[in-house]
From Swiss-Prot:
Gene that specifies this protein: nfo
Note on how the cofactor is bound: Binds 3 Zn(2+) ions.
Origin species: Nitratidesulfovibrio vulgaris (strain ATCC 29579 / DSM 644 / CCUG 34227 / NCIMB 8303 / VKM B-1760 / Hildenborough)
Binding site for Zn(2+) 1: H66, H106, E143
CDD domains the record matches: AP2Ec
Protein name per UniProt: Probable endonuclease 4
Family in the record: Belongs to the AP endonuclease 2 family.
NCBIfam families with a match to the protein in the record: nfo
Molecular function terms, GO-annotated: deoxyribonuclease IV (phage-T4-induced) activity; DNA binding; DNA-(apurinic or apyrimidinic site) endonuclease activity; phosphoric diester hydrolase activity; zinc ion binding
Length: 282
């Protein structure tokens, strides 16, 4: 069975995210290591890093960070590109201090420059981040998108081409978001649509490149090019889509993280985790 968990808040200190994932019975954690709405957020204190390490050792599961949504790694503007690179370097530094396994990053938007140009810019900027960090760094996972606007990643080949264009391809992988794939036109709720998605992964970045799943149902229709998450089984993907994924032997031990609404605190996370585990036994 896959490892199930959720994105948890780090409010009050990053170690609180570990505390809360244990409380809800999660086996894998995703978090923001700092305020993702700020370009230069405050780094975790030394005491919080130590507390995170203690709780992480007791938790024992994989930990992922989601990079700030402010970062457009495909930006070609000099100042904006430098700002994106700097923000990702700082993210890597925080993750290295915390012992985070991998960083999830949206592949960015080309802003009208064209898909090919955006892909090359993303690869160049990613290479600069790895060059500046050197040594031991977390793995960087490029997340697929719903393909909204000029965003890269709606086509899974975008992720493959960024990886192929990077000098640090061995340190790159893929995070597959079910709601994003659905929004981009992959009908994961049908046998044919699921098969097409898996074939595009296999012929693009490769199945081995997929290190993490974001398991989210979708409020919007397939192919809408929109990104609206909802609870498992309550959206247009429906339970059938998740039965296919959760019981696919290729991903039998993969980490899978919820990014579903938290309007009632941790209760929704508990319900969604219970649903995933039930469907994984279907």
């Amino acid at each position: 069975m896959p490892l199930f968990g959720a994105h948890m808040s780090a409010a009050g200190g990053v170690s609180n995210a570990i505390r809360d994932i244990v409380e809800i019975g999660g086996e894998v954690l995703q978090l923001f290591t700092a305020n993702q709405r700020q370009w230069t957020p405050k780094a975790p204190s030394e005491a919080d890093v130590e507390a995170f390490g203690r709780r992480r050792a007791a938790f024992g599961g994989p930990v992922f960070s989601h990079a700030s949504y402010l970062i457009n790694i495909a930006n070609g503007d000099g100042a904006a590109s430098a700002k994106a690179v700097e923000a990702l370097v700082r993210e890597f530094e925080r993750c290295t201090a915390l012992g985070v396994d991998a960083v999830v990053l949206h592949p960015g938007a080309h802003l009208g420059a064209g898909r090919g140009t955006g892909i090359l810019r993303a690869a160049r900027n990613i290479d600069e981040v790895f060059d500046r960090c050197g040594g031991q760094t977390p793995v960087l996972l490029l997340e697929n998108t719903a393909g909204q606007g000029t965003c890269l990643g709606g086509d899974l080949n975008d992720l493959a081409e960024i990886i192929d264009a990077s000098r640090h391809a061995s340190q790159l992988g893929v995070c597959l978001d079910t709601a994003h794939a659905f929004g981009a036109g992959y009908a994961l709720h049908t046998d044919e649509g699921y098969r097409r998605c898996m074939e595009d992964i296999e012929h693009g970045p490769g199945l081995a490149a997929v290190r993490l799943f974001h398991v989210n149902d979708s409020l919007v229709p397939c192919g809408s090019r929109k990104d609206r998450h909802t609870h498992i089984g309550e959206g247009q993907l429906g339970e059938a889509a998740f039965v296919r994924l959760l019981n696919d032997p290729v991903f039998a031990m993969h980490p899978m993280v919820l990014e579903t609404p938290k309007e009632d605190g941790h209760a929704a996370d508990r319900r969604n985790l219970a649903t995933l585990r039930r469907l994984a036994r279907s």
